[in-house]
Structure formats: structure tokens, C-alpha cells
Design a protein with these regions (language model features):
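A short beta-strand micro-motif
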Residues: 2-6, 25
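Transition segment at domain starts
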Residues: 5-16
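Short, surface-exposed charged micro-motifs
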Residues: 13, 31-33, 72
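Short hydrophobic/aromatic-rich beta-strand segments that constitute the beta-sheet cores
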Residues: 24, 42-44, 82
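Glycine- and acidic-residue-biased ligand/ion/polar-headgroup-sensing regions
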Residues: 32, 36-50, 78
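An anionic, turn-rich surface loop/hairpin at beta-sheet edges
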Residues: 48-72
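C-terminal partner/receptor-binding element of secreted or periplasmic proteins
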Residues: 66-87
Length: 87
């Protein structure tokens, strides 16, 4: 299960196995796009300046143990986090 948070609030929850794009548009102009494709999730777009979240690459159940942030993709400037969890 993919869970997208804005700040501490759950924004959306989606299956890892249903392809889709989750668009987060905040009142302050921040925008992120989380893409779910073929059992993987990644930050496809962000308005943040540093683009660290986009550069974190894709997350799958098979690669979370080897990722620096484990089962998270984090966009600190926009306060958007993506968690790959069970369910």
C-alpha cells in the first residue's frame, strides 16, 4: 500500500499494483506528482528547488532494504512524504 502525506495528514492511499498518478497541489503553490507503475512508486515531479525527492528514484518491495530512506520518499521543502507499507 502506498500512503502519501502532506505534513502529518494522510493525503491519499493507493494500491501499489494499480497504475496511477497522484497529484498534490497545495495552496502555497507547491506541487508534487507521485507515480505508481507496475509495482513501483516514485516522485515524478516536484516544484521544490533541490529535486532530492525526484532523485531518490523508484521504490519497490524488493529494494526498500537497500534504499537510504528505506520505505520512504521525502520532499522536505514541500512537506510531502510517500510511504510504502503493508496492506
Amino acid at each position: 500500500m502506498v500512503r502519501v502525506y502532506v505534513g502529518e495528514e494522510l493525503y491519499e492511499e493507493a494500491s501499489l499494483y494499480m497504475d496511477r498518478t497522484i497529484v498534490i497541489e497545495q495552496d502555497n503553490g507547491c506541487r508534487n506528482e507521485v507515480r505508481i507503475e507496475k509495482g513501483r512508486v516514485y516522485m515524478a515531479f516536484s516544484t521544490c528547488e533541490n529535486q532530492n525527492c525526484v532523485n531518490q528514484g523508484e521504490m519497490t518491495p524488493d529494494n526498500i532494504a537497500s534504499r537510504a530512506l528505506s520505505n520512504w520518499i521525502i520532499c522536505l521543502p514541500n512537506r510531502v512524504t510517500v510511504e510504502l507499507g503493508e496492506g
